[in-house]
Amino acid sequence: SQIIALDWRCGALLAKLSQPQTPSSLSADIPDITEEIAQKFLALLMATQMLSPETEPTPLMYWEFHDLLFHSRSRIGRHNNPSGGTMRFFGKTEPLPIVKPPMSDKVIKLVQPNLEYLTQIDIPLTKALELRQSIREYDEQPIRLQQLGKLLYCCARIKKIETIETEEFGTLHFSYRPYPCGGAIYELEIYPVVNRCQGLAAGVYHYQPLEHCLYQISAHETQVEELIEDAYKSSGEQDQPQVLLVITARFGRIFWKYESIAYALISKHVGVLYQTFYLMATGMHLAPCALGIGDADNFAQITGLDYYEESSVGEFLLGSVRN
């Protein structure tokens, strides 16, 4: 149902219904609105299912305003706004590039694992699914750089870039990676924050998925400690994290195509990347743990990112399994 208010008094009545009202209190202070009119207005709203009897406990009691708005606005059915791949910025701006430009000149090359060999020795998918669990305690010997590189390669590298010519939207570029992504857009970036890793100095790095390498952004001990401490608290304070994978989104890359559902898609992409990390880490006998919260402002300040252009949207802990 939809209400189109042709008189300001209708809007005033609706606004007052944000608080508990009786017909008498509803009609007060609004010119020419009597208690009888207020009763008929309420009857109309009930008949059109704009109002419904309150149940005990009401399901609405569990909702926060922003959660319900996000849920209803990113699904169809309760609004008439454009939704989906509307290409709303076509002709206004160019899409962001598939690969983010280097953030520093300090490059750490990563070893590419032998995928053919891995397919022969890796544990079956069903076993990985059954063994998967969140592990927050680590061995004294930390994760190795080779293991970190293998996980990033198997989970997040760019396997292929494809260019398609379209009549309506011109030239479009896509990439393909191990985890799925709506429209093959891949707006997510991965920033390893290293506390303890054999073969890699502590610091904040950016993973370049095409060249399969790390760019060091910061070696500042205080900044690393700050991010690690936040992750430690978010994970239940069981053990100091060895590596924190901060996942960001380059918003413009996905907002360029999708309308109404873009941020919901980002959340789904973070979820499938989490599961990909989990299964790969389980197969590698590592300790994985997804986090539910992180400080996007603090990460933006440390990395120099523009909060509205690229912000952290997920965090994932990785370390060596305690023997």
Language-model-detected regions and their locations in the chain:
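Long, charge-rich, low-complexity alpha-helical segments
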Residues: 2-121, 130, 159
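Cell wall/extracellular polymer interaction/catalysis modules
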Residues: 126, 141-144
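Glycine/small-residue-rich phosphate/adenosyl-binding loop
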Residues: 181-274
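A glycine-rich helix N-cap at a beta->alpha junction
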Residues: 304-323
